[in-house]
C-alpha cells in the first residue's frame, strides 16, 4: 500500500478578490483521501502564512498549498526554498502571476483537482536585497504603483489600471547604473524589472520568453515614453510582444547590481517595500519544488496568430504616428527658415 503524503493548505481569508468561503468544503470533496492526509490552516495576520509554512516544512509535510493571491504565494514559497517540501497553489488573488505562468487552472475546483496528480518539479527563484521573489521584482514606476495599489482600499485589475492612468504621465523617470558580468551602463528608465517568470499577473507579460528553469533572470529596462507611446506599450504587455517595443531593452543574467541616486521603493511579487539606493538581485537555480500542471508545466510565452495580428496593427499605427511626428518636425524647421528669410526682406 502506498504511503499517504501529508499536505497542508494555508488559506488567507482576506487576499485577492475571490471569496474562499467554500474552499475548505471543496478540499474535503476533491482531494483524494487515499493519497493524502489533509490539514487546513487559516492565516490571521501578515506574515502568518510564512510562519505556518516554515513550521510544516520542519515537520516534514510533503506539500504546502498557498490558497490566496501573489502575496500569500510568496509568503508560503519563501519558507519552502531549499527544503523537500513542495509548494502548491490554489489561485484566489487579483493577479495570480506565478499560478498563471505555471498554467495552474484559475478555476478553484480544477486547481484543487490538479493536486491529486502530485507532479512535482524544481524551479528557480530570485532574491532582491535578501527578499525572495518567484515571479518579478521591480523598481521605478512599477514599484511606485505597487505602493499606491497597496494603499488603495480596493483590489483587482481595474484599481491597478486606474492608478497607472492617474500617475503614469506625472511620474519622473530616474537614472540607474546597471551592472552585470559584462560591465556597467547608465540608463534613464521609467522602470526596471527583473523577471524569473513571464508575467506580473492578469496575463500582463513583462517578459514573454522568461522561464523558471534556465538559471537566469530576464532584465527589462523601459525607457521614458510619451502619452502617444502608451497604447502601444499596453498592447505589447498583454499581447506577449513587449520585447519588440522600441522603448524596451532586455537581456539575461544570473546576477545584477543596480545603483540609483537615493533610496526608494521596490516590489517583489507585487509586495512593495522601501529599500536602499544600492540593489542586488540574483537567481537561485532549482531552489524550490513546485506542484505543477501535468498537462502544461510552464506558459510558453509565445503570442498566437490573433495576438500577432493585433500587435502588427498597433505597430503600423505607431509607424504612422512617428512619420507624422517627423513630418511635423520638418515643417517646423522649414517654417523657421522661411521666417528668418522673410525678416531679412
Which residues does each predicted region cover?
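N-terminal glycine-rich "phosphate-gripper" loop used for MgATP/nucleotide binding
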Residues: 66-70
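ATP/nucleoside-binding phosphotransfer catalytic cores, i.e., glycine-rich phosphate-binding loops
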Residues: 20, 221-345
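Short hydrophobic-aromatic micro-motifs
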Residues: 131-137, 186-195, 200-201, 218-221, ...
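ATP/NTP phosphate-donor binding region
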Residues: 1-64, 297, 307-319, 332-345
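Internal anion-binding site segments
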Residues: 180-182, 188-253
